[in-house]
Structure formats: C-alpha cells, structure tokens
From Swiss-Prot:
Keywords: Endoplasmic reticulum, Lyase, Membrane, NADP, Transmembrane, Transmembrane helix. Belongs to the sterol desaturase family. One of its GO terms (cellular component) is endoplasmic reticulum membrane. GO terms for biological process: lipid biosynthetic process; response to cold; response to salt stress; response to water deprivation. Homodimer. The chain crosses the membrane at residues 46-66, 100-120, 127-147, 183-203. It comes from Oryza sativa subsp. indica (Rice). Aldehyde decarbonylase involved in the conversion of aldehydes to alkanes. Core component of a very-long-chain alkane synthesis complex. It is an enzyme of class 4 (lyase). This is Very-long-chain aldehyde decarbonylase GL1-6. Its main location: endoplasmic reticulum.
Length: 635
C-alpha cells in the first residue's frame, strides 16, 4: 500500500481471492467454442484463441523467474542488494498475477470491438517492425517522463511509493503497482499493439511476443542478481543504451532519483539521470563476490515432507511458502501440481540450497534433500537417502560450515544412528553434527502446564524420548507408559534412583500426554476431555479430538535480529523455528566444541539457557505460562 493511498489504489477484484480467475472463464470458454466450431481456418480468430493459453504460459513463466531468482540469491555470488526480505513484502506482492488477468481481459475486449484483430495471421514482418519502432520511440520516451512524474512527492505518496516499498526486489516486484498506476502503464504499452491492429499489421506472434518481451525485461530488471554477460556489450557497444541490466535498475530502487528508464537506458543518458555508479556496480556484481566471504557458519539439512511441500519452500510458490504448510486455500490445486512436479525430483542427486539467513555475524543456510518422507520410511530407498545425507555432510565441511543440524528424518536412528554414523566414518570431521535433542526436550518441558505431577508418554523409543524421560524424572514428575516395550526400553537406560518415577500403567487418565511418532487416533480417543497433547516428535500428531488441546511441535520464536526470514518452516507459523534447527544456531553462537549426535547430549538446561540468552523465545501456540527466571519453564 502507498504511504497515502490515492483513488483507485485497490484492484477491482481485490476481495475475490483466487476466484478472480473466474472473470476470465466466460471469455475463455466462448473463445474456445468459436475456435473449435469455426467452419474454416479463415474464420478462426487466432489472436482471441491464444489469450487463455498465453495467460497460463505467463503464469508459469513468472513462477520460473521467481524460482531461478531465489535460487541465485540464496547462493549469493552475483546478488546485487544484500538486504533482508520480509513477510510484509511477500504479502504486498502476492497479487502479482493481477496484471496478467487484466491483460487477458483487455485482449478479449480488443478482439470483440476491433474486427481487424479477428483476422490476425500468425506472422507479420511489418507488424514486428512497427512494434519495435513504437516501443523504442514513443513508449520508452513517454514512460521515462511518466516515471519522473510519479516521483513527484504528490504522486509518489499516493501511488508509486507502493512499488518502491520493496528495496530488495524480486522478479514479480516489477508488476506490483496500485490499480490506477497499472492502468496508465497499460495504456502506454498498448500503443504498439493497438497501432498494429489499426494498420492491419497485427499478428499472433507480434502481439504475444511483445507481452513476452515486456515480461522478460520486467523480471530481468528486478531479479536482484546480475546475469547479463559483458560480451554482449563488447560485440555491440550501442546495446548499452538499448538494454538495461538488473544492477542498473536496482540503483533506481536504492537511490530513487536515478535510472528512470523503462528498459532502454538511452533516455537516462540523454537527460542526465544515469546513476554514476551504474557501470561500477555492473562490473562488481557480474564478477561476483568471493564465495569464501559468504561461507555458511550453520547449515540446516532438511527434506521435503508431503508432495505439496514441493511448492512450500522458498524456491516454490512465494505466497504459499510464506504461510504454514497446509494453510493454503488452494490445497487441491497444489496437490495436482505436485503430482506433476514430484517425479522430477528423482533426477536430483544432491541437495539444493533453499534459504540464506543471518543472525548477528552468523551466516545460516538451509539445504534441502529432494526426497519425501515416504522415501525415508521405505526400506528400498533408505540407503540412497543415507548417501545423500552423507554427501551433504561432506559438502557442508567443504564449504567451511562450523555446524550442521539434522532436521526431520535426517537424524533417524535406523538411518544414521542420530547422525553418529558420519562422525564414526570420519573422526576428523570439523563440522559439528547437531541433532538438537537438548533444545527440543527443553521446548517440550516449557509447554507442559505448570503444576503437572504426572504425564503419559506414548510413541516409539528413541533418543529424545529417553532424554525427555530422564529430565522429567529429575524433576520428580511421574512418567506413565502403557506400552510395555517402551517402558522396559527406557527403564533399563535410567539409573536405579530414577526408575521409581517410571510407571507401567493401563490407565489413560493423565491430563498431559507427551506424544511421539506412532501414536494412533484410537489411542487419542482414550484421553479425557481437555487433555493436553504435547508432541516431542519432529512431526505433529493427527488431531483426532476436538475437545482436547494440541500443542505445536518443539519450536522457538526467532530473535528480532534474525534476517531474511520470509518463509514458514513446514507447519510452523511465521518467525517460528523448530527447536532442532535453532539448536545448531545456538551451538555456533556459543562456539561449543563438540557434536550432539548419537548418544551425546549437550544438556537440556545448558541449551535452553543459551537459546534464551541469544534472543530466542519460547513458543507455544496455546500460550501457557512462560519461562521462569531460571529458564526452566512451567516445571
């Protein structure tokens, strides 16, 4: 929103959500019907028929630019503006497809009102020349002066400030404008197409090719990484005045009063508004920063979960990734798209970099193993997954990372003995492997309501259930279990004086249930009304009861100084991080020398106190009484 929104700021279909595509449906259906039922090829309106396919292609093209741009800026080598992107910008730019819908509606209107457009051929050389000349002349000239006018304080405050709210640009930032401003741009950019229609030189390729050109140049200028090769300007020096670069336009977003041109910098050079640092910035960003200067201090290794999680990561759908997994209203559409994209993941033989964050002087990256939860639970895929994790550990060490955290199922005991396998195979491993058990247990303890005297522990026997049980016993909290195998497994690993707090019971009467993996809906139905389900697992339990309280998986709120966080971690809310991921960051900040994997434990109280001291805060979606002065939580 502009700082002082003017008239016609909101788009007409602002309140329709994704139903706005229904505005195009009648015209698209009628266009297809006319094309199919035409008695001869001469009667087919090619330009009208291509409107809907072009709408779909432009949506796909825009998404590809988002993915490529975010992949490049996560790598950071040719990144231009190295500032933080936030959730506010993601929300502001989520309607980037509005201008594509508006284009489709305008094309349908032109086709219906101008008979010349209904007989457009596939190709017209004259039309291509007319379009190129009119764009380089009137369009670029008028846009330059319009753009300068929009930077007048009255128009800027009411309209153009909405676009300039994004200092760190993404490809789709290019089309984020108030409705009235976008309409003016449409009138301006319609000059070449309407002129070819009026002169009878319009063609399907010319009209749609011009749209592709506009999209390409818009996305290029706002992608925030330099990719235009220097050889183009060496081969044809005048190109410098006909083609802007991402670094050239980025200066307009950081300096505001320079580099006003649309796509051709010639008018900035003519009227003396070229930023003096344009050439220097281009050379510097094209060469790229020394990757050693951006070595990750912490790498968080995660993986995909359900098929729709393909799009719920930073390289996927920006608006979807900025909300918890499963919160998107278009869930069915996501699952359908995932069915197409998921098989392609098998072609990836290594991790990909998804996020790059910063806390204080710590560089933090998130790497994703392109495999789903189903691959981790499959015996046939277990070895392949283990090799991918081992390669990621080697890559992290080669990159100079001090700490690597194993997220989700990457720390499974059957897979790698909670990460210990990689330390055993390489005793000289400099990168510290952290499974985050201590901080996860501390987060669970903090969610247990104050005054609790006994809990019911359910789930599979694993490292975190053992450490959690030990911590509860030290606090003289009775730990009940109904599973004899789990009871015997945990009891034999506790000291005799602690075993008295373990109880094998047939009763499900405890008001606090600590649930891990493997808890069924049938077991949940045995809980009393109002019982608290507190997960200690990586994955949240299925919510089988409406009359009970379900807490989130172990997590913490990140410090305010945590930069460049604009995606949600799986099912967690914004700016909330899983305890396992946070553990690695704390480990690096404290410069602890040692692994936390296998049977090694940092210490529950030690990890919790350090996390709080570093700015992390307890998180519980039901906001039970918080931590006490000694950091022990409600217990």
């Amino acid at each position: 929103m502009a700082s002082k929104p003017g008239p016609l700021t909101q788009w007409p279909w602002n309140n329709l959500g994704n139903y706005k595509y229904a505005l195009v449906a009648p015209s698209a259906a009628y266009s297809t019907y006319r094309f199919v039922t035409a008695s001869s090829a001469a009667e087919r309106d090619l330009l009208n028929f291509m409107v809907f396919p072009m709408l779909l292609l432009r949506l796909l093209y825009g998404q590809l630019w988002i993915t490529v741009s975010r992949h490049q800026t996560a790598r950071s080598k040719h990144k231009i503006v190295n500032k933080s992107l936030d959730f506010e910008q993601i929300d502001r730019e989520r309607n980037w497809d509005d201008q594509i819908i508006l284009t489709a509606l305008v094309f349908y209107l032109v086709s219906a009102t101008m008979p010349q457009a209904q007989v457009a051929p596939w190709w017209s050389t004259k039309g291509m020349v007319v379009t190129a000349v009119l764009h380089a002349g009137p369009v670029e000239f008028l846009y330059y002066w319009l753009h300068r006018a929009l930077h007048h304080h009255w128009l800027y405050a009411r309209y153009h400030s909405h676009h300039h709210a994004s200092i760190v640009t993404e490809p789709i930032t290019s089309v984020i404008h108030p409705f009235a401003e976008e309409v003016v741009y449409f009138v301006l950019l319609a000059i070449p197409i309407l002129s070819t229609v009026a002169t009878g030189t319009v063609s399907v390729v010319t009209a749609n090719g011009y749209l592709v050109y506009i999209d390409f140049m818009n996305y290029l200028g706002h992608c925030n990484f330099e990719l235009v090769p220097k050889c183009l300007f060496h081969v044809f020096p005048p190109l410098k005045y006909l083609l802007y670069t991402p670094s050239f336009h980025s200066l307009h977003h950081t300096q505001f009063r320079t580099n006003y041109s649309l796509f051709m910098p010639v008018y900035d050079y003519i009227y003396g508004t070229t930023d003096k640092s344009s050439d220097e910035l281009y050379e510097r960003t094209l060469q790229g920063r020394d990757e050693a200067a951006w070595r990750p201090d912490v790498v968080h290794l995660t993986h995909l979960t359900a098929p729709e999680s393909v799009f719920h990561n930073r390289l996927g759908f920006a608006a979807v990734a900025s909300n918890p997994l499963g919160a998107a209203a278009s869930g069915h559409l996501l699952r359908a798209a995932s069915a197409v994209a998921s098989p392609l993941l098998s072609l990836f033989a290594s991790t990909f970099r998804s996020e790059a964050n910063r806390l204080d002087k710590l560089n933090i990256e998130t790497w994703v193993i392109p495999r789903f939860t189903s691959h981790y639970t499959s015996k046939s895929d277990g070895y392949k997954v283990s090799r991918l994790i081992e390669k990621a550990v080697s890559d992290a060490e080669a990159s100079g990372a001090r700490v690597l955290t194993l997220g989700l199922l990457n720390q499974g005991y059957d897979l790698n003995r909670n990460g210990e396998l990689y330390v055993v195979r390489k005793p000289s491993l400099k990168t510290k492997i952290v499974d985050g058990t201590s901080l996860a247990v501390a987060a669970v303890l903090n969610m247990i309501p104050q005054g609790t005297k006994d809990v019911l522990l359910l789930g599979n026997a694993n490292k975190i259930s053992l450490v959690l049980t030990l911590s509860l016993c030290k606090r003289e909290i009775q730990v009940r279990m109904v599973n004899k195998e789990l009871y015997e497994c945990l009891k034999q690993q506790l000291q005799p004086e602690m075993q008295e707090h373990l109880v094998l019971s047939r009763s499900y009467s405890s008001k606090v249930w600590l649930v891990g993996d493997g808890v069924t809906d049938e077991e949940q139905m045995k809980a009393q009304k109002g019982s608290h389900f507190v997960p200690y697992s990586q994955f949240p339990p299925n919510k089988a009861r409406n009359d009970c309280v379900y807490h989130c998986t172990p997590a913490l709120l990140v410090p305010e100084s945590f930069e460049n966080l604009h995606v949600c971690e799986n099912w967690l809310p914004r700016r909330v991080m899983s305890a396992w991921r946070a553990a690695g960051i704390v480990h690096a900040l404290e410069k602890w020398d040692g692994h936390e994997c296998g049977g090694r434990v940092t210490g529950v109280q030690k990890a919790w106190s350090a996390a709080l001291a570093r700015g992390f805060r307890p998180y519980d979606d039901h906001h039970h009484p918080g931590i006490t002065h000694d950091g022990r939580g409600g217990l």
